[in-house]
Amino acid sequence: MRFLFYSHDGFGLGHTCRNLAIARALVAASPKATVLLATGSDDCARLDIPERVEILKLPSLRKLANERYGSRNLVVSESEIRALRSRLLSSAIETFWPDVLLVDKHPFGANGELRDGLERLRDHGGRSVLGLRDILDAPETVAAEWRPHGLPDRIHDFYDRVLVYGQREIFDSVAAYGFSPALAARTAYCGYVAAPEETPDDRPSASTAHSHAVPRPGAGRPVVLATVGGGEDGFELLRTFLETAGDAPWRSIAVTGPLVRNGEGQRLAELAGRSGAELHRFVPRLGDWFSSVAAVVCMGGYNTVTQGLQRGTPLVCVPRTHPRREQVLRAEALGRLGLLRHLDPARLDASSLKAAVTEALGLSRPNLARQIRSHLRFDGAEVAAQHLLAQARARRGMRRPGLRISVPTPMLALA
């Protein structure tokens, strides 16, 4: 069974990491499953790729505004990067011919780049599944973006299933985003998708893991970790965190993310050096550190929050408010249940952050873990994998189109 996963990753790494967690669950659930994962992330090669999963690297995007993406590295126009990526995706679909296409968040891809391939797959009997994170944005913003394009109806026309990586009782996407009854009937809530902790067999050798060893508390000082996802817009939070590190009663570790701007990364390195904090640019499987640290300071992105809660780690969130409000809505929803602490980024300073971290360190971790488990499910990847396998089985019996490849006659090498 062949699966093609798509994520645009114009901002951060969240979409690719979520798709990768589902791919890992999928190949674990079926020895017949194989996944081609299309992404524009420049850091995909650093991620832990399981067997029977291959990365199709697309030219990278950068987010210009909501629903607008340009090239991150190539000096080309928006229309040119859209055409290039669209043709690569269409070629992958028409060569690989997946039984099921899983699309993360954007029904027709960034800048509509997936529309042609999606139509070709539909015309040849392939199945398509749309995956949505728990919260997309404020309902009024989503409505303003979707209605002019008739997206709810078009999603119904092109997609056999919609998977929400969250829980209705935490945030009701179907109601908030105005799904039609027909589209609601095709929608399933999977629970939260969180990458599993590594097993001893998964762990790298000492020689390869030395620079990223799991942090341990020392001299009676707990470890507090600050992470801002990909790092494109986390400078202010990390700067404030490092300002608290000099006289804090904890050991401070900060991870800037691979997308941090060079100038900002240098300033953070100087701050870390003065305050005695530890600074990393990128840590593979950073979520595995969450069980070992006393608290995590973060922005409020889906993957960081989900992995932190899955491991019962006290979280202090300073959510992003622009260009989307999904992090604010997530932090507020989970904060109302007492599962995390969150601060208004407009009022962030060293004093308020230090107070919030101190409060988080005072929590009973066993009690917090029990409280989290009473509200949240973290089997979203496994549930999503079962939905994808069901779609693949439903497609079985349909003939995969034949592939005609023109192989050029090789030129004779000159002696």
Task: Describe each region flagged by the PLM.
Residues 118-189:
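Active-site-proximal region of nucleotide-activated glycan assembly enzymes
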Residues 5-7, 25-80, 84-86:
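Conserved nucleotide-sugar phosphate-binding/catalytic loop shared by glycosyltransferases and other
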Residues 23-25, 177, 192-295:
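Donor-nucleotide binding loops and adjacent catalytic segments primarily
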Residues 285-329:
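A donor-sugar binding/catalytic signature common to diverse glycosyltransferases
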Residues 7-20, 43-44, 234-235:
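A short, glycine/small-residue-rich beta-strand->loop->alpha-helix junction that serves as a flexible
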Residues 89-111:
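Short N-terminal targeting/anchoring amphipathic segment
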Residues 355, 359-415:
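C-terminal amphipathic helix plus adjacent low-complexity
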